[in-house]
């Protein structure tokens, strides 16, 4: 526990080593008395993602982090589903081109897979599942899902974001996710929607 402006802060472990995700959540949840700490800062290694869905993997990650630290945990599992590919890369989005693949390698593999697919048939959906576990054996974890629909562009554009953002084109805005500002993206993205649901639950819980 730590104090912030007279408020006792409850430590919550975030089941990720991604500093961007930690900062994003830390700023948003501080107002609810939650002190977000990355699992890497507590010496927690990543859980093996053996689930078949985003929800299963998010729960696995949260339960692992909570069991090791004894703290409440939040986990995020996200990915991109392309309609014409039957929902691929899906839960394998981060390792689409291999276990150690870079964002660029994953992106290039997807562009190659869609090389002959015309406009109008390149619809895709980003999904984000956020899970909140009060403790490792929590029988009723809080689960929040956000989705974002767009199209896969024929080439990358923009330098912001990460992952598939440079080729995820949003027709309503006329730009890719990587061409948006952080605040603009958070207002419409899959992660932003899931975060808003989590924040709403915290307000009423």
UniProtKB/Swiss-Prot annotation:
GO terms for biological process: nucleotide metabolic process; purine nucleoside triphosphate catabolic process. Its cofactor is Mg(2+). GO terms for molecular function: dITP diphosphatase activity; ITP diphosphatase activity; metal ion binding; nucleotide binding; ribonucleoside triphosphate phosphatase activity; XTP diphosphatase activity. InterPro entries: dITP/XTP_pyrophosphatase, ITPase-like_fam, RdgB/HAM1. Its EC number is 3.6.1.66. One of its GO terms (cellular component) is cytosol. Binds 1 Mg(2+) ion per subunit. Keywords: Hydrolase, Magnesium, Metal-binding, Nucleotide metabolism, Nucleotide-binding. It catalyses: XTP + H2O = XMP + diphosphate + H(+); dITP + H2O = dIMP + diphosphate + H(+); ITP + H2O = IMP + diphosphate + H(+). The active site is at residue 77. The keyword Hydrolase applies. Substrate binds at residues 16-21, 78, 162-165, 185, 190-191. Mg(2+) binds at residues 48, 77. HAMAP family: Non_canon_purine_NTPase (MF_01405). Pyrophosphatase that catalyzes the hydrolysis of nucleoside triphosphates to their monophosphate derivatives, with a high preference for the non-canonical purine nucleotides XTP (xanthosine triphosphate), dITP (deoxyinosine triphosphate) and ITP. Seems to function as a house-cleaning enzyme that removes non-canonical purine nucleotides from the nucleotide pool, thus preventing their incorporation into DNA/RNA and avoiding chromosomal lesions. Belongs to the HAM1 NTPase family. Homodimer. This is dITP/XTP pyrophosphatase. It comes from Erwinia tasmaniensis (strain DSM 17950 / CFBP 7177 / CIP 109463 / NCPPB 4357 / Et1/99). The lineage of its organism: Bacteria, Pseudomonadati, Pseudomonadota, Gammaproteobacteria, Enterobacterales.
